[in-house]
C-alpha cells in the first residue's frame, strides 16, 4: 500500500537515489549534493509517496498558497510508475496549494 506524507523532507541520499530510479536524475544536478540539498530545503511544499520504508515518489514545489504553485519536480520510480502515484502526488500538491491556486508543471518527454 502506498502512503503519502506532506511536509516531510526525506534524507538527501534517498531523494537522489529516487531521482536516479525515476530518470529525473538525468535532468537534475544529482552529483552536486550541496545544490540538491538547497533545492529540497528551499522548496516550501514537498509531498512524498512511500511503499513501506522505500520512497517511491516525490513532488517538490514552490507555492504562495493562494494564487500560484509551481511543481518543479515530479518523480516516481520506474518500478512504481503506471500505478497512479504521480497523479496522486499532483492532486495532493494542487490541494495543498489552495482551492484558488493555479498549478504549473512543465513536463519533459519520457
Segments the model singles out, each with a brief description of its role:
Residues 1-30:
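Short amphipathic alpha-helix that is part of the acyltransferase structural core
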Residues 15, 71, 103-105:
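Generic structural signal for conserved hydrophobic packing positions in ordered secondary structure
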Residues 32-35, 57, 70, 89:
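Hydrophobic alpha-helical segments typical of transmembrane helices
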Residues 37-48, 99-102:
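A short helix-loop-beta-strand connector motif used in the catalytic cores of GNAT acetyltransferases and
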Residues 48, 54-63, 68-75:
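Conserved beta-strand in the GNAT
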Residues 67, 109-110:
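A generic "binding-loop/recognition-motif" signal
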Residues 76, 82-95:
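Conserved acetyl-CoA-binding loop-helix of GNAT-fold acetyltransferases
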Residues 90, 95-108:
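Conserved GNAT acetyl-CoA-binding A-motif
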